Amino acid sequence: MAAITAALVKELRERTGEGMMDCKKALEKAGGDIEKAIDDMRASGAIKAAKKAGNVAAEGAIAIKDDGKAAVLIEVNSQTDFLALQDDFKNFVAASVDKAFADKLTDAAPLIAAQEAAREALVAKVGENVNIRRLVRVEGDVVGTYLHGNKIGVAVVLKGGDVELAKDIAMHVAASNPEFLLPSQVSDEAIEREKAVFLQLNEEKIKGKPENIVENMVKGRISKFLAEASLVEQAFVKNPEIKVGELAKKGGAEIVSFTYFKVGEGIEKPVDNFAEEVAAQLAAAKQ
């Protein structure tokens, strides 16, 4: 059994929206397995769904540079959102993404090395840590991007179609954050888990029903799950009457890939105890 740490309880709480004690009990029951705890909570009806894994707590900005055939996305992190709004930080981010695109970089390491002197100068000036965290470059027949408030960035690669179509699909990805491009990419394990949760959640409803009826109910739920999880099956946000895959096909395109960046995704930022912080400040003031 895995140790039930405060960090684990916090992650479950963030992913489910449930109370601290309920999350602790669910983890204890699941032997410290957070995914099993979520499944158990869903099966009991305590929650309908859970957010994707990843503690999102760091600040900073996403930046994108593209020319319709290629795009570079980078994430630069700061300790506070205040710094992320300042010109010094914005200028560093802009210079970094410009260099990444001009040099056709495909990995963050060379960009980090190239920008280290500028980063150190910025840190010395603002008194706050700044880091280039990640970089992705994509290329294709058609590349469209979408940036939402410098916090979410998306690049979509199409075979055929045009940049406007790619941008529309990128905007949809930013709004819906699909896990997969195609239903076929959803793992058998994920499908089986969804099936098990559905059967537990609807145990009373399906009791006594013929096997073929239950099978159709399960198929319906799995179909809905695949539609929610895969981009091509999702209803297009600007026109829910058409699926994203159909939109692409109508525009003479095939979606090759999508890349989604969100500031701080997967980074846990330490949360100080407020009472302890105040006490520490008072103690420091007395010295």
From Swiss-Prot:
Lineage, uppermost ranks: Bacteria, Pseudomonadati, Pseudomonadota, Gammaproteobacteria, Pseudomonadales
Gene Ontology MF term list: translation elongation factor activity
UniProt keyword terms in alphabetical order: Cytoplasm, Elongation factor, Protein biosynthesis
Primary localisation category: cytoplasm
Role according to the record: Associates with the EF-Tu.GDP complex and induces the exchange of GDP to GTP. It remains bound to the aminoacyl-tRNA.EF-Tu.GTP complex up to the GTP hydrolysis stage on the ribosome.
Family affiliation: Belongs to the EF-Ts family.
GO cellular component terms, A-Z: cytoplasm
SUPFAM superfamilies the record matches: Elongation factor Ts (EF-Ts), dimerisation domain (SSF54713), UBA-like (SSF46934)
Coiled coil segments of this chain: none
Keyword Cytoplasm attached: yes
Protein name as it appears in the record: Elongation factor Ts
PROSITE patterns reported for this sequence: EF_TS_1, EF_TS_2
Localisation per UniProt entry: Cytoplasm
Sequence segments annotated as region (Involved in Mg(2+) ion dislocation from EF-Tu): 80-83
Source organism superkingdom: Bacteria
InterPro entries: EF-Ts_dimer_sf, Transl_elong_EFTs/EF1B, Transl_elong_EFTs/EF1B_dimer, Transl_elong_Ts_CS, UBA-like_sf
One Pfam short name: EF_TS
Gene label: tsf
